[in-house]
Amino acid sequence: MAEQKKYLLFLATPDSEFAKKTYGGYHNVFVSLLGDEGEQWDSFRVVDGEFPEEKDLEKYEGFVISGSSHDAFQDTDWILKLCDIIKKLDDMNKKVLGICFGHQLIARAKGGKVARARKGPELCLGNITIVKEAVMPENYFGEEVPANLRIIKCHQDEVLELPENAKLLAYSSMYEVEMYSIKDNFLCIQGHPEYNRDILFDIIDRVLAGGHIKQNFAETSKATMEKNEADRKFWQKICKNFLKRQPSLLV
């Protein structure tokens, strides 16, 4: 009998009331996107200082770092500790998928530069352009590489400079770095492949209620999803292929 494959999710955000009520928390949101039958998915709420033992990292096939309301360039203890773990996972040649904050933190840990987004925050359905020559059609993207992909965006920071040896995989009219990879170890995505319309709208409503955005910004953000949806199935394929297959993403 094949040994059960294990994956670890670093949760860098608390569960919203909506996420808990609707999905049982963000753990389940991620597993619904990335998980397969027979796998074990463990979560550690790193934003609350909950981390796995270093000796236990070896037993996991792959790792996911979630989004967060915190800035990846902050020097709080849990963020610095997560940076150290990223470096250890790199040394171990482990697969690490970085989402939003995770995308930014991996860039920081690997020597890149992260800062407040120069063109302002995004809370919307965005369209990103794939750098076709940077990916091989027969690998994680499948037989055909699309020119563009839609993805839900929810962030106020950005990667300004890629780490050495990083490969740019996607960009947009708003941001120069929407997706990148480093060797076969890291795949990093600024958007949220795990989000859907309901999750985005709940975030917009909460941010609006907190006074962080204005009503017209909230309405414009929601309007981006009136006629279109995120390419969730395609993102699911990319992320699962990265975490669970061996071929290189790089040309």
UniProtKB/Swiss-Prot annotation:
The keyword Protease applies. Residues 16-213 form the Glutamine amidotransferase type-1 domain. It is found in: Cytoplasm, Cytosol. CDD domains: GATase1_1. GO terms for cellular component: cytosol. This is Gamma-glutamyl peptidase 4. Pathway: Secondary metabolite biosynthesis. The active site is at 100 (nucleophile), 192, 194. One of its GO terms (molecular function) is peptidase activity. Its EC number is 3.4.19.-. It comes from Arabidopsis thaliana. Disulfide bonds: none annotated. Keywords: Cytoplasm, Hydrolase, Protease. It comes from the Eukaryota. InterPro entries: ChyE-like, Class_I_gatase-like, GATASE. One of its GO terms (biological process) is proteolysis. Involved in glucosinolate biosynthesis. Hydrolyzes the gamma-glutamyl peptide bond of several glutathione (GSH) conjugates to produce Cys-Gly conjugates related to glucosinolates. The gamma-Glu-Cys-Gly-GSH conjugates are the sulfur-donating molecule in glucosinolate biosynthesis. Its main location: cytoplasm. The keyword Metal-binding does not apply. Belongs to the peptidase C26 family. Coiled coil: none annotated. PROSITE patterns: GATASE_TYPE_1.
